[in-house]
Amino acid sequence: MKNIMILSGAGLSAPSGLKTFRDNDGLWEEYDVMEVCSATGFRKNPKKVLDFYDARRVQLQNVKPNHAHEKIAQLKEKWGKNLFVITQNVDDLLERAGCKDVVHLHGFLPELRCLKCEGIFNIGYEKIIDKQCPKCKSKDLRHNIVMFEEQAPAYATLYSLLNQTSLFISIGTSGAVLPVGRYASMCEKSILNIYEKDANLERYFDKIYIEDIINAIDKIALDIENFMKDGNV
């Protein structure tokens, strides 16, 4: 049986109410991106960065998975090991929708990482203050998020799985961080879902849905069915 990859970005979780860098309101407007999302910013002002991620956890607690998260969870249940679910998002909405084995390329917001023993543990939506590592009891902790200027270990997993993928599906990502057009060209067939037209990106894909993922996801599910039957989308 052939393998499918769904790679998602901010456009997957935006309908749930999670703000992105491109929004003009909400959490992000108060911050300079490089101050709170870069290794340099963390070295300069760790408290500001940790406070920022505390605020993001609070925001995450107050939103729910949307229909697209739930549909992807159903697709994963149906296709199992033949469907790779990869996301640039750091939220837990796919997991809350019941999706198993999600690969988070840029880390996971509910988790902290110990700077002493490198242990990773889940604190849900709580603040980092007064937390300690369950392994070594250290309080020298940070968010388990890959910031700008840091290595993303999960990229190795992404590229390994891409080499096994026949149908590549890109959902809600502009290609600004990852070259999804190049990924599409590595696979037999490809589907793109974006909210606004982008001719430079569209040219790499076989099928394109320029619409909200809530409207597109059921069509994409049908495309997967067709691909698994006869290799076409």
UniProtKB/Swiss-Prot annotation:
It is an enzyme of class 2 (transferase). It comes from the Bacteria. Keywords: Cytoplasm, Metal-binding, NAD, Transferase, Zinc. NAD(+) binds at residues 9-28, 88-91, 172-174, 213. One of its GO terms (molecular function) is NAD+ binding. Binds 1 zinc ion per subunit. 2 residues (Tyr-53 and Arg-56) present in a large hydrophobic pocket are probably involved in substrate specificity. They are important for desuccinylation activity, but dispensable for deacetylation activity. This is NAD-dependent protein deacylase. It comes from Campylobacter jejuni (strain RM1221). The gene is cobB.
